[in-house]
């Protein structure tokens, strides 16, 4: 039997800097900070870790849309993805619903935009794929010329 290749997994770190604040480092060398609101013992100096999950979804699907629309030869001039969410009342207070709002600018075909959103949410966005089995994800699209 042939040896199986060894997979090296990327390492991410979260280093406590006091209070409820952490500096996170990615495997690609980038850093960001998280904190919690004052009522949770933090100083509210940065997004919470849970907010980063929702922000990650916005970024992931946004990257997909920009790429897919470029491939469809759609003249995208602007894109903003925002999220609102609901959380469970009891701990661990996970997301129960996320609603994405896509605001796009350009002379775009609405049918192609909806197709790009569907491809992102159903096929390409890994964050969406991880959340969707447990979280209701809905969306709306606004296109401005």
Regions found by a protein language model. Name each.
Residues 60-61:
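Alpha-helical metal-binding/catalytic segments enriched in His/Glu/Asp
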């Amino acid at each position: 039997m042939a040896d199986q290749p060894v997979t090296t997994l990327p390492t991410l770190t979260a280093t406590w800097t006091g209070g409820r604040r952490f500096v996170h480092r990615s495997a690609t060398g980038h850093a960001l900070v998280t904190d919690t609101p004052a009522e949770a013992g933090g100083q509210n100096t940065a997004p919470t870790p849970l907010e980063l999950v929702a922000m990650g979804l916005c970024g992931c699907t946004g990257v997909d849309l920009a790429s897919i629309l470029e491939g469809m030869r759609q003249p995208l001039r602007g894109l903003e993805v925002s999220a609102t969410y609901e959380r469970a009342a009891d701990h661990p207070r996970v997301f129960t619903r996320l609603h994405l709002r896509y605001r796009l600018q350009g002379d775009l075909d609405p049918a192609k935009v909806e197709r790009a959103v569907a491809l992102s949410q159903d096929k390409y966005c890994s964050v969406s794929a991880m959340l969707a089995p447990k979280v209701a994800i809905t969306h709306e699209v606004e296109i401005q010329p």
